[in-house]
Amino acid sequence: DDVESRGLGDVYKRQEYDLIIVDSSDPFGPSEGLFTREFYGSCFNALKEDGIMVNQQGSPFYTEDASAMQRSHKRIASTFPVSRVYQAHIPTFAAGYWLFGFASKKYHPIDDLDADAWKALNLRTRYYTTRLHVGAFYLPAFLEEMLREVEEPK
């Protein structure tokens, strides 16, 4: 008996996702498993070929968070062909300044941004603009240096 003839083919097919959003708490304690190379590898395998994963990376202004951000970025960058860190100001978060990760098998967050397609949607947002999108990926020099310290040459 093969699996298809018994109608069980779908059970054995791996689900694939367009987007994985990892909205975890701090990379310590119970959510520590969401910051491992194995977890990022599972996310990579679960994404479609043009899929994207985003995750929180903490604040660079606290030593423990900054070290965790570097570890996380190193693990993601070694797993995904495209890995970038972006920033946002969130007053209710510690230090009011937070970092996030963007990872993809295919798309670069700036080079592949289609601003005209976004404008064609004619959505009115109170926060997001394509200019803000691009600007979020331009990091201060101290952060660029922190990320370079852990990136492997490609």
List the model feature ranges, each with a label:
Residues 13-19:
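A short acidic, Gly/Pro-enriched loop at the edge of an enzyme's catalytic core
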Residues 37-49, 77:
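A short glycine-rich, Lys/Arg-flanked "PGG" loop and its adjoining helix->strand segment in the class I
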